[in-house]
UniProtKB/Swiss-Prot annotation:
GO terms for cellular component: cytosol. It comes from the Bacteria. This is Phosphomethylpyrimidine synthase. Pfam families: ThiC_Rad_SAM. [4Fe-4S] cluster binds at residues 409, 412, 416.
Length: 433
């Protein structure tokens, strides 16, 4: 193999098997796709050691992808329960799964996830450094942080979140700034604490070139995390957030010089009127790199319903150019999600992604809706269920309330508008009584 990474291959004019797979899935010209990868506007996270991967592309002119978070923790360390979540995520066709494990047999779990998953796998090595090493945060060395990152790469993780933009100068602004929620990124807060406890610069920032060595060797995509993402709408689009984004833009260029693929992570909590400006800022400051957002959640008052607040923001964000959505479940801010929460979160994220794809005129997006509309006009219930984003729920709802006439539902019965117009146009007897 005479290339190191997907970006290196693209710049050398080589079309990889992963590019061919993505081209077929997306119905886009493979040479146009290669050009987008070469200039950093599309990434194909594909670790050389992830043998079960079915490659996906993230970025310009492609379908918006969704990610599912899971993993073992001190309070919920049942590996089998989390592996069942992996199976559900795969069955529901999530394109990415992030293992956020931070306690116990993290490597054993990670290896199983990579082995069984055709979805691209992401991780946050910072979490693992604390849980796996079983050391006090202050005592973890820079070399140990790098060793954990290398282990994740060896194990086949396709993309890693690192909070390299949280520099000492950014931290100083956080300390001087009147933020309501300070740092809500778990990895970011751990790094902030390490820096303060050791009175040192961010080790992920100072060792960035060594991390690029690892990513280049295994073709790991960098997901540059936003440690300073807003945790409430009051903190959104402030100086702290933007200062970190500027640093991420600089790091993006450094990664590209080494042919390492990059995504940029984004908010977070954000009022709906600020979403478009934030997408424009990321695309400008980070040179068109794919944008990966958590939400954004457009209001802070809805615990138990944050899959909805997230879907509202996510749909608008995608419409304005976001490329990748991290799902949010009804359990957000409350507890670890269970399987039902997961399913709700996946469906909400998929709806938001699809709504955004319609606005972006992504190939095939509108056709799906048109087929559903045709099935409704024809009162073809079997076809409606087949096309539904959640066929199981749609069929269950209909079965729970069976109409007298099979060509209608219990909302309108014989007064169904589709039924009425269809009968009139076909010169059939109407019979509303």
């Amino acid at each position: 193999m005479n290339y190191t990474t997907q970006m290196d291959a693209a710049r050398k004019g080589i079309i990889t098997k992963e590019m061919e797979i993505v081209s077929q899935k997306e119905q886009v010209d493979v040479n146009e796709l290669r050009e987008l990868i070469a200039n950093g506007q599309v990434v194909i996270p594909a670790n050389k050691n992830h043998k079960s991967l079915s490659a996906e592309g993230v970025g310009k002119n492609l379908r918006t992808k969704i990610n599912v978070n899971l993993g073992i923790s001190r309070d919920c360390k049942d590996i089998e329960k989390e592996l069942e979540k992996v199976r559900v995520a795969i069955d529901m066709k999530a394109e990415a799964i992030m293992d956020l494990s931070n306690y116990g047999k993290t490597r054993e779990f990670r290896e199983k996830v990579v082995e069984m998953s055709p979805a691209m796998i992401g991780s946050v090595p910072m979490y693992d450094a604390v849980g796996y090493l079983e050391k006090e945060l202050k005592d973890i060395t820079e070399e140990e942080f790098l060793n954990v990152i290398r282990q994740h790469a060896i194990d086949g993780v396709d993309f890693i979140t690192i909070h390299a933009g949280l520099t000492r100068s950014v931290c100083q602004k956080i300390k001087n700034h009147e933020r309501l929620t300070h740092i809500v990124s778990r990895g970011g807060s751990l790094l902030f604490a390490w820096m303060e406890l050791n009175n040192k610069e961010n080790p992920i920032y100072t060792n960035f070139d060594k991390i690029l060595d690892i990513c280049e060797e295994y073709d790991v995509t960098l997901s540059l995390g936003d440690a300073c993402r807003p945790g409430c709408i009051k903190d959104s689009t402030d100086g702290v957030q933007i200062q970190e984004l500027v640093v991420l833009g600089e790091l993006t260029k450094r990664a590209w010089e080494r042919n390492v693929q990059v995504m940029i992570e984004g908010p977070g909590h954000m009022a709906i009127d600020e979403i478009e400006a934030n997408v424009v800022l990321e695309k400008r400051l980070c040179h068109g790199a794919p944008f990966y957002v958590l939400g954004p959640l457009v209001t802070d008052i809805a615990p138990g319903y944050d899959h909805i607040t997230s879907a509202i923001g996510g749909a608008l964000a995608c419409a304005k150019g976001v490329d990748f959505l991290c799902y949010v479940t009804p359990a957000e801010h409350l507890r670890l999600p269970n399987l039902d929460d997961m399913k709700e979160g996946i469906i909400a994220a998929k709806i938001a992604a699809h709504a955004g794809d319609i606005a972006k005129n992504v190939k095939g997006a509108r056709e799906w809706d048109n087929k559903m509309s045709k099935a409704r006009a024809d009162l073809d219930w079997c076809e409606m269920f087949r096309l539904a984003i959640d066929p199981e729920k749609a069929k269950r709802y209909r079965d729970e309330s069976t109409p007298t006439h099979e060509d209608s539902c219990t909302m309108c019965g014989k007064m169904c508008s589709m039924r009425t117009v269809k009968k009139i146009l076909n010169n059939e007897e109407l019979n509303l009584i």
